[in-house]
Swiss-Prot record:
Residues 611-622, 629-648 have a biased composition (Basic and acidic residues). SUPFAM superfamilies: Clavaminate synthase-like, DNA/RNA polymerases, P-loop containing nucleoside triphosphate hydrolases. ATP binds at residues 1059-1066. The keyword ATP-binding applies. Keywords: ATP-binding, Helicase, Hydrolase, Nucleotide-binding, Nucleotidyltransferase, RNA-directed RNA polymerase, Transferase, Viral RNA replication. This is RNA-directed RNA polymerase. Residues 602-648 are annotated as: Disordered. The lineage of its organism: Viruses, Riboviria, Orthornavirae, Kitrinoviricota, Alsuviricetes. Residues 1032-1191 form the (+)RNA virus helicase ATP-binding domain. Residues 747-835 form the Fe2OG dioxygenase domain. It catalyses: RNA(n) + a ribonucleoside 5'-triphosphate = RNA(n+1) + diphosphate. Transmembrane segments: none annotated. InterPro entries: (+)RNA_virus_helicase_core_dom, AlkB-like_sf, Alphavirus-like_MT_dom, DNA/RNA_pol_sf, Oxoglu/Fe-dep_dioxygenase_dom, P-loop_NTPase, RNA-dep_RNA_pol_alsuvir, RNA-dir_pol_ACLSV. The keyword Oxidoreductase does not apply.
């Protein structure tokens, strides 16, 4: 880290003794004390942090104890500084000063300033503004006060109200010697800025000739002053004339001091002094945005903080993939809460530019210099940049600098307005309005009134784009009928000429809120020409949508207000009113408003009706202008208003015509019923629909008849226990649905028709089935009466015939509704939007156990699960749901799909279902129920014509549609190619297989090889098929031939993953299957080696889906969608083509994915029988002729071999000493390898003969057999056969080993003889030590290799992940994480020898699990166990089986194993309240701080005690701290990107750091002491923002590492350790003596202010930064949540909760007990166990009495720690506890999730063997024996290491079947039957 610079004085002081340093610091203290006494009154205002920093940098004194509140503290502090620090120092030297416009109390303060005090003065005030009356008191008079002449005058904050003439007159009259004046005026105005450069200190606005100044941005404190009166800033002198003599007198104007907007001027008679020609201001922490972004913007922003911009730019430059979201997140992190929206948009624009185009480099090439030179010479360069025809963004970015400006002074400066006009001269003087819109943005263009002057042609030229489409909603609503609300129209001046459409404007707030439910007035925007071509922005499109919605609501509102019920009533009213309307071409002049009828309601005239529809619509968009609408409109009439206008003429003739519109029905008769948006309509005619319903096939249900109709047929619909028959919507029901779509704007596609019996009731419910989104729902009351009730209001709605009820979108989430039928035959139609089908799980729940008898019967016959059949034939399942059962037709459909035959015996005889083959079973159909009568034995699984589908979890579709997409994301080196199946190549391999030349189990005559292809039923058919495939049949006429010919017109995409040996070719795809597709039966892996199959099975592929190439061809592939060909080079030539042929014949080729994995540099397939018959081209070259992406690196081979092969390796091991040594024979090689401790795992030979020869030396394999395997060490035999091997086989041999290998001669002669006879190849290069070059190796490949090399750090730097990609979903956290290169320290490897105990055979008596059941009698009734409240009980103990109960039968849950323990759930309010009451304490911040301050001395005392027992050196190890920060970030980023993105809300910078989210942990409390207990309070968890974790977690990790490194051996902390380490500690220190345990009460709550003081003092000793410590104290003292502020306490979920709990536990133990040196003690959070009998002491009682932390002392001979028994033989977990947990998992169907972890706990006790009798009583031994039998019998369920462990332990069991319970064990202190008694001796 970088150290700060220290001056020589600081260096000297740091070396002086402490006493001398204190003497010098005493002087500084006295000086600060005096200064504070003098200035505290004027500089103690509380200022925001940014303002404080600015004042400090400006040299303004601020009191360190700022507490005084003020409305504008910043400007007040600045004024005081100017008065008492600056002005006083200048005017104090005068004997007399006349003071104007200043309060007396300020002058009295200036009297008390010591050396700078003002001695003699007069206060002469006058009233300038209205506030001066109150400011100066009643003595001030409005006339000018007498002011002495030729004296010294000081004017305070008034001169900015004086004009230049007034100041000149004042100087002329009084002729002062010295005039000192303070001026408040933002200087940036004179530089052309319209906004403040110090917005945190002041802001201003310019309104015409006035300047509105707002101190601290507070608008209520603002005052107005003339804009022109800032002339002093640009004046160098003022010239006046003597009234008597007329002589000119020059007064010099000097700017003595300027800070912000406050200035001090000294005006005095001119002397021969240099003038101030330039006044310089700045630099400010801003930059001119216009200098970077020259293009026009919608809303201008002039400045932006430069420091923030630099940090964002540097951050963006450091990202590999900069994006807009990251930049905005960084802006939010760097800014306070008061961030402007314009700044966000600016950063978005900047980041978008960087993301899209990047930034050019700083260095410049020749052509780059030429381009810059050419750009500089361009004429109109700035104009070209503004309109986007040229760009110099990078150079503008490089030239950004802090904002600064100069003001040049003169004797006669320009006025401020003239200066502004001069700066903006281009805009104001330009008459080219097109240029104005480009330069200044459309918004400003409109505001400055440029729009009326722009002609249509000019606008079209400016923004070419697209046509404006015609409106389909009313654009005008002006008529006498709408007179209840003030409605006006607005248009531009060229309205008639441009045929623009006016917009509706509601001037009344009341009308606005009633009509549109908005709260503010609508804005009037000029409409665009209807005939022009204009490109619309997203803003315009959104505005247009809002305008349409507003217009429709307006019309609806007024029609409802007119109280018309139908169209006819509206037509009558319109006729009555229209007789009074007369319109002519000149228009009718009226005062106040336009009287017009809605244009969209008019029918076109006869002439127009003959025209084209487009023209008629265009004409309807034009209306005559009403010239007399208002004075304003009349005044703005353009000179060409007399042009004849076309439009709809609203005369008597037109009005007499019918005024019907197809849209009008939509607005008449509607009634809004409640605020939730419920709408009712009346007067609808559904007689035709009622007639159609009478003829519909409705299903009889309880109290009604019903059916479901869909536009998107077929769909199923059901809910609860009811399902409905489904039909396609046709006829009138379809017409009604389409009409409702148009009327309501909702895409209805389903209708539920129900005919009710009288009195039928539907209770309160919501239509929230999973097939729906929260769209609108329309209920049509076709016939009959009903009452409709909702929860959104209390009124009951009566539904009559023809009524409609619309429940809008979002209604179902918040409200429910109920219906009561009031008449027989009442018919309703409910229209909904059926978005999706029900899930498979929902359908399965509906039919399972009730309607699934057919699926169960067929599944039993064909040995499958019913769910698999349902998934394979989903439409049969849908019919079963709709019809509530299956029929014979469904059975036939299932058999036809599976191509099987099943007999079904029913009431009408025997029926055969299916037509293929013999019957494989018989079913009975009795009483609408299918059951199995008999099942014939069949080789169903081996037939190619049977189908193996996928599981019932929908994995098939998941694999089909998603796998190749996901594979592209996780595998960067994926290769793909489009392949056409080569039939001749496939035919050759097929014939070779049938003839027995290839393979061993595919011969046609002996192994029924004809079963490989679907549709082939005999050998003869297969022979004909082979001839057809090879093209040897001239005119074949069959379906098979047509099927094969289809392949000539198909291309299949093949994917490939290729790489060097050990490069991890299968790693990504295996991880993908393991994490996302595990257990899918839609996957088939084809492996040529048995060991490869084992690897795939461990990675999540079912063993039965891993095939050799022959078994793959003979098996059924119909249910597969993913085919992985591992080591494709070892597959026979033509296999891929034959496999694709087989897939095509079964109809799955198009929807399947094929992935090939292999290495072109390794050995390929070879068989002497078929070598001359099959194609010569290998599979890789055949499929990927254009080359493959190749992983040119390895994780396997050591550095020695990697160097020889010119490849990079991630294996850090250099190589064994015998690496590549050649020994004379095998015994010599074996001897020397074993002597150096290199165990030989394999011997590789070149031929099978050699394999037999060396078989007695151990594991021997040929080069080809070892392909794909990995070993540590081995021997390669050099024989004559090895000389003949290809380089590919040699490559296989030398790349099998991690650590290394040696050679052994296997031929006669010496090493030199062998080397001389070798050919020049890879083997010769390796044996000679020369090595092979990259070119040599790549030249041996059959295809072009596109190398993908790993970026391997040459030193210790390793970048282990793409952190930016991982953080893509959490841009807030991205800004907190270090994204640079990480460095890992590589620790030297050492060999650790660990002795293992000999296993002891153990005889375990057999015990029946039935004997363990009676213990459940200890469970009390639920009413005695639960918490009870006013509104019910808690819900910790289950009594009844829930709907998802998966146990074979529903048992009494009150006696289940889960009922033994309390369960906490998030929705259990009483448990949560109990948790709050027990585990939380509340207090205010002031009390927390006060208590902490009082406890600081106690904290130091506790730290001293702690360090006495755990000595730790004071100071900080910065390297270790950096490493901890790196480890924390790596751990944080080790989660998947999806998981990080899901928690992104925790990274939000707006999350208050002193607030947490509190919730309760959902868990089953399976601790031993919780068995059979009453309800327990929940465990509260705290969720902190990520900023807290990022800040403190690295320091906590550092503390943990330092503590661990310095911890004495006799202390054990169970953190980041496994149980084997705890076992070693117990064996080492446990001696069977009495042990001591501390049982803490409310441990987290008890960690109060005293513990916090201890933590702070200890962490300071550890080297924590003081800033971090202060932040930690603040967090602990101010933390709160929605419930209120917390007292100082510990929270579960807080960073490093375990560490701080452990520290508190340790210091309490050291205070409570006498702990001699060497005493073994285990600590883990609040758990403590001392393995010796410690004596309690009262030495530290005065401290312990102050602690809230209390503990009960427990002495025992059976110590328990973290739920484990500690004994001299190791660890034991209570067997009954494991047994009951297992039973709970079995009850809940979660055995597979927990069996491995429970086995791990069990194994510690199991490996103790006979020694277990010394530690367990007989009851626990019975549990242990039952567990032993369970794990042995279910070992096939174990995975990973557990499977190996059970195999190692299995032989220890020596059961003989006797049920020997042994002797009894009485109560003991800790254990099975009693937790309070002392342990007794075993009675065996």
């Amino acid at each position: 880290m970088a150290f700060s610079y220290r001056t020589p004085q600081e260096e000297l002081l740091s070396r002086l003794p402490q006493s001398q340093q204190e003497v010098i610091s005493g002087f500084q203290y006295e000086r600060i004390q005096k200064e504070e006494e003098k200035k505290v009154e004027n500089f103690s205002f509380y200022l925001p942090e940014k303002t404080r920093e600015w004042f400090t940098k400006s040299g303004v004194y601020l009191s360190p104890f700022a507490y005084v509140n003020h409305s504008h503290p910043g400007c007040k502090t600045l004024e005081n500084h100017l008065l008492f620090n600056v002005v006083a120092s200048y005017i104090s030297k005068y004997s007399y000063v006349a003071c104007l416009s200043i309060k007396s109390n300020k002058m009295s303060k200036m009297e008390r300033l010591g050396p700078n005090s003002v001695k003699t003065y007069d206060i002469l005030n006058r009233l300038v503004t209205a506030k001066d009356k109150a400011r100066y008191g009643p003595l001030a008079k409005p006339e000018r006060s007498p002011c002495p002449k030729k004296t010294n005058i000081f004017i305070h904050d008034e001169i900015h109200y004086w004009s230049r003439d007034q100041l000149e007159t004042f100087l002329q009259v009084h002729r002062p010697k010295n005039l000192w004046a303070t001026l408040v005026f933002p200087p940036e105005i004179l530089a052309g800025y319209k906004s403040s450069v110090l917005p945190f200190l002041y802001q201003f606005e310019i309104h015409g000739k006035d300047l509105v100044y707002m101190p601290d941005g507070v608008r209520s404190e603002s005052y107005t002053q003339p804009l022109e009166n800032g002339f002093l800033l640009s004046s160098s002198s003022i010239i006046i004339k003597n009234r008597v003599t007329g002589v000119e007198i020059r007064y010099q104007v000097s700017l003595v001091y300027s800070l912000g907007s406050h200035h001090l001027f000294h005006i005095y008679p001119a002397e021969d002094l240099m003038k101030e020609e330039v006044r310089r201001f700045g630099p400010y922490d801003l930059f001119d945005v216009g200098s970077l972004f020259v293009k026009p913007v919608r809303v201008p922003i002039q400045d932006f903080p430069l420091s923030v911009f630099k940090k964002i730019f540097i951050y963006m430059s450091s990202l590999k993939k900069p994006d807009v979201q990251s930049a905005v997140a960084k802006l939010r992190q760097l800014s306070d809460a008061d961030i402007s929206i314009e700044s966000v948009f600016m950063i978005q624009e900047f980041a978008s530019r960087i993301e899209k185009n990047g930034v050019e480099s700083w260095s410049c090439s020749f052509w780059g210099c030429m381009k810059d030179w050419f750009f500089d010479k361009l004429p109109y360069r700035e104009v070209l940049e503004k309109i986007g025809l040229a760009d110099d963004f990078t150079r503008r970015l490089m030239k950004i600098k802090p904002l600064a400006f100069d003001i040049h002074t003169t004797d006669r400066p320009l006025t401020v307005r003239m200066i502004i006009d001069q700066i903006w001269e281009e805009r104001l003087s330009s008459f080219d309005n097109i240029s104005n819109i480009v330069f200044y943005g459309r918004r400003e263009w409109l505001n400055n009134g440029v729009l009326p002057k722009v002609k249509k042609k000019g606008l079209a030229k400016l923004i070419p784009g697209r046509e404006v489409d015609s409106h389909n909603y009313p654009r005008e609503i002006y008529s006498d009928l709408l007179s209840s609300t003030s409605i006006w129209r607005s248009y531009d001046d060229d309205f008639r000429h441009r045929s623009a459409s006016p917009l509706v404007i509601l001037r009344s707030n009341r009308a606005y809120s009633e009509a549109a439910k908005f709260s503010s007035n609508c804005l009037s925007l000029c409409a665009a020409p209807c005939d022009e071509v204009i490109a619309r922005t997203p803003f315009e499109l959104n505005h247009r949508r809002e305008k349409k919605e507003l217009s429709l609501k307006c019309l609806d509102f007024h029609i409802k207000k007119m109280k018309v019920k139908n169209v006819l009533e509206l037509e009558v009213k319109l006729r009555e009113r229209n007789t009074r309307i007369s319109l002519s071409k000149k228009g009718v002049k009226k005062a106040g408003r336009s009287r017009m009828i809605p244009v969209h309601l008019l029918k076109p005239t006869c002439g127009e009706g003959n025209g084209k529809p487009e023209e008629r619509n265009k004409e309807e968009a034009k209306i005559p202008m009403n010239e007399g609408t208002s004075k304003e409109e009349k005044g703005s009439e353009p000179p060409h208003s007399e042009v004849k206008r076309e439009g709809v003429r609203l005369d008597e003739q037109h009005i007499s015509e019918p005024l019907l519109s197809f849209k009008l029905d939509d607005f008449v008769g509607r009634e809004k019923l409640c605020s939730a948006g419920l709408i009712k309509t009346v007067g609808n005619d559904y007689l035709l629909l009622a007639r159609q319903i009478e003829c519909m096939p409705l299903s009889q249900l309880r109290g009604k008849k019903a059916a479901y109709f869909c536009l998107d047929f077929p769909m199923v619909y059901f809910h609860d226990k009811v399902s409905y028959p489904t039909f396609e919507a046709t006829g009138e029901i379809r017409h009604v649905m389409m009409k409702a779509r148009s009327k309501w704007g909702i895409d209805f596609n389903s209708a539920l028709i129900q005919v009710y019996n009288d009195g039928c009731r539907l209770p309160l419910h919501s239509d929230n089935e999973e097939c729906y989104d929260d769209d609108g729902i329309l209920t049509i009351n076709v016939v009959g009466d009903a009452k409709f009730h909702t929860t959104c209001h209390d009124e009951v709605i009566d539904l009559k015939q023809g009524n409609e009820i619309l429940m809008p979108a979002g209604y179902q989430k918040k409200n429910r509704h109920a219906v009561e039928v009031a008449s027989e035959g009442r018919t309703s139609v409910t229209l909904r939007v059926h978005k999706r089908d029900f899930s498979f799980e929902s359908k399965l729940r509906f039919i399972k156990g009730k309607f699934d008898c057919l699926f169960v019967s067929v599944a039993e016959i064909i040995h499958k699960k019913p769910e698999e059949i349902m998934m394979f034939i989903p439409h049969i399942m849908d019919r079963c749901v709709s019809n509530r059962g299956c029929s014979l037709d469904d059975a036939k459909a299932i058999c036809e799909k599976y191509e099987i035959k099943i007999e079904c015996e029913g009431d009408c005889g025997l029926v055969e279902c299916g037509t293929s083959g013999l019957s494989i079973g018989r079913m009975l159909l009795r009483g609408n129920h299918f059951s199995v009568a008999s099942v014939r034995r069949s080789s169903m699984d081996s037939l190619a014509n049977s189908s193996k589908e996928i599981k019932s979890d929908g994995v098939l579709d998941h694999v089909t549609f998603n796998f190749h997409k996901r594979l592209k994301l996780v595998e960067p080196d994926l290769t793909n190619a489009d392949i056409k199946v080569d039939s001749s190549r496939a035919g050759k391999l097929l014939k070779s297989l049938m003839d027995g030349m290839t393979g061993i189990v595919s011969h046609n005559s002996t192994h029924e090889g004809w079963r490989m292809i679907k549709g082939i039923n005999s050998t003869s058919e297969m022979r004909s098929f082979m001839n057809m495939v090879r093209g040897q049949i001239e005119e074949p006429k069959s379906d098979l031939f047509d099927k094969v010919q289809e392949l000539n017109f198909m291309k299949v995409k093949i994917y490939g993953i290729f790489g060097f040996a050990g490069s991890g070719k299968s790693h990504a795809i295996q991880n993908l299957i393991q994490t996302e597709f595990k257990g899918s039966q839609g996957i088939m892996v084809i492996c040529p080696r048995r060991f490869l199959a084992k690897d795939w099975s461990e990675k999540g592929v079912d063993e039965k889906d891993i095939k050799t190439f022959e078994s793959a061809l003979k098996s059924d592939v119909k249910g597969k969608r993913l085919f992985i060909l591992d080591e494709i080079s070892l597959l026979p030539k033509g296999f891929t083509d034959l496999l694709m042929l087989k897939m095509h014949m079964e109809g799955i080729l198009k929807k399947s994915t094929i992935v090939c994995i292999g290495d072109p540099l390794q050995a390929g397939y070879f068989c002497p029988k078929d070598d001359n018959y099959l194609s010569r081209e290998g599979e890789i070259k055949r499929l990927f002729k254009g080359g493959v992406n190749y992983k040119w690196y390895s994780y396997r081979i050591n550095k020695f071999i990697a160097k020889k092969l010119a490849i990079e390796t991630m294996n850090d091991f250099i190589g064994i000493d015998e690496q590549s040594s050649i020994y004379k024979d095998m015994p010599s090689a074996h001897h020397f390898m074993e002597k150096k401790g290199n165990h030989i795992e394999v011997i590789l030979v070149a031929s099978m003969v050699e394999k037999e020869l060396y078989s007695n030396y151990g594991n021997v394999m040929t080069f080809g057999e070892s392909q794909g395997l990995t070993f540590n060490c081995g021997v390669i035999v050099l024989s004559e056969e090895a000389k003949l091997c290809s380089d590919a086989h040699i490559m296989v041999a030398i790349t099998r080993f991690r650590r290394g290998f040696c050679f052994a001669l296997g031929s006669k002669g010496s090493k030199e003889d062998y080397m001389r006879s070798m050919k020049s190849g890879l083997l010769q290069r390796i044996c000679s030590g020369v090595g092979a070059s990259k070119e040599f190796i790549l030249g041996s490949s059959s295809v072009n290799l596109i190398l993908s090399e790993k970026d391997i750090a040459k030193g210790a730097g390793i970048d282990e992940m793409d952190r930016e990609a991982r953080l893509e979903g959490d841009v807030w956290l991205k800004s907190m994480i270090y994204l640079g290169k990480r460095y890992h320290m590589v620790e030297p490897l050492g060999q650790v020898i660990k002795l293992t105990d000999d296993a002891i055979k153990c005889h375990i008596p057999v015990c029946s699990s039935q004997t363990l059941g009676p213990e459940l009698d200890n469970i009390q009734a639920r009413e005695y166990r639960e918490f009870k409240g006013k509104n019910g009980w808690s819900n910790q103990f289950r009594e009844e089986a829930g709907p998802n109960w998966k146990f074979p039968y529903k048992v009494n849950q009150a006696m289940s194993y889960e009922a033994v323990y309390p369960r906490h759930k998030m929705d259990d309010d009483l448990t949560f309240l109990a948790a709050i009451k027990k585990r939380l304490r509340f207090d205010n911040v002031a009390n927390n701080y006060a208590k902490f301050k009082a406890a600081e001395s106690r904290g130091k005392y506790l730290t001293k005690i702690f360090l006495k027992h755990v000595p730790i050196k004071c100071g900080r190890d910065q390297r270790l701290l950096d490493q901890c920060r790196q480890e924390f970030e790596e751990t944080k980023l080790s989660k998947s990107a999806a998981t990080i993105g899901a928690h992104s809300q925790r990274s939000d910078s707006d999350w208050p750091l002193d607030k947490i989210f509190l919730f309760m942990k959902s868990q089953l409390c399976t601790k031993f002491e919780k068995r059979f207990t009453e309800a327990k309070a929940g465990q509260t968890l705290a969720c902190f923002p990520h900023k807290i974790l990022v800040e403190f977690s690295p320091w906590c990790r550092y503390t943990e590492k330092v503590l661990t490194a310095n911890l004495p051996d006799n202390y054990y902390i169970h953190q980041r350790k496994n149980f084997s380490e705890l076992e070693d500690f117990a064996r080492r220190f446990s001696n069977g003596s009495i042990c001591v345990e501390s049982d803490y009460t409310a441990f987290d709550v008890s960690q109060d202010h005293t513990i916090l003081a201890f933590e702070v003092e200890l962490l300071r000793h550890f080297g924590w930064d003081d800033r971090v410590l202060q932040s930690y104290i603040k967090m602990k003292c101010t933390l709160g949540c929605r419930l209120g502020g917390f007292a100082i306490m510990r929270f579960t979920g807080e960073f490093s909760t375990f560490l701080f709990n452990t520290l508190a536990n340790m210091v309490f133990t050291f205070c409570r007990y006498e702990v001699p040196d060497g005493t073994p003690i285990c600590f883990a959070g609040d758990d403590m166990c001392a393995l010796r009998n410690l004596r309690e002491i009262d030495t530290h009682e005065f401290i312990l009495s102050k602690l809230s932390l209390k503990a009960k002392v427990n002495r025992t001979k059976v110590p328990m720690f973290c739920g484990w028994r500690l004994c001299c033989d190791g660890l034991i977990k209570e067997p009954c506890l494991i047994y009951e947990r297992l039973q709970v998992a079995i009850e809940n169907g979660r055995l597979m999730d927990v069996i491995d972890s429970y086995f791990l706990e069990f194994s510690f006790a199991y490996k103790l063997g006979e020694r277990l009798y010394s530690h367990l009583e007989i009851e626990q031994l019975n549990y242990h024996q039952v567990l032993t039998r369970f794990f042995i019998r279910n070992k096939h369920l174990l995975r990973g290491d557990s499977r190996h462990n059970i195999s190692e332990l299995e032989w220890l069991s020596d059961e003989d079947g006797d049920n020997d319970k042994g002797s009894q064990i009485e109560d003991r202190r800790r254990g099975y039957s009693n937790c309070w008694g002392e342990k007794l001796q075993n009675l065996f």
